[in-house]
A protein has these predicted regions:
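Ribonuclease/tRNase effector modules and their secretory precursors
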Residues: 1-89
């Protein structure tokens, strides 16, 4: 059993926010609201040889099932992630 994933803070770059809108029709704030301080997230860890360790998290955004890629960020308070992307299915 994987331990629960808690996202206390989500870092979203301008480039990622623009990509979400242009490629996937999602607003970064919608993605943020689906994950930050939300319990019971379904996820799996993936260690990609090129991109490193990341969490692949399932969520529903605007009624669409999505997979969101989160990268752990070194932070003294912990539970901080950078948004990689979000893929509606």
């Amino acid at each position: 059993m994987v331990p629960p994933l808690w996202v206390a803070r989500l870092i979203v770059s301008q480039a990622t926010a623009e990509k979400l809108t242009a490629r996937h029709g999602l607003d970064w704030q919608e993605v943020h609201d689906a994950f930050v301080c939300v319990s019971g997230l379904r996820y799996a860890w993936d260690d990609d040889p090129e991109r490193g360790l990341r969490a692949l998290v399932e969520a529903e955004i605007r009624g669409w099932p999505c997979v969101v890629v989160l990268y752990p960020v070194e932070d003294p308070l912990g539970d901080v992630y950078a948004l990689g992307s979000a893929y509606p299915r």
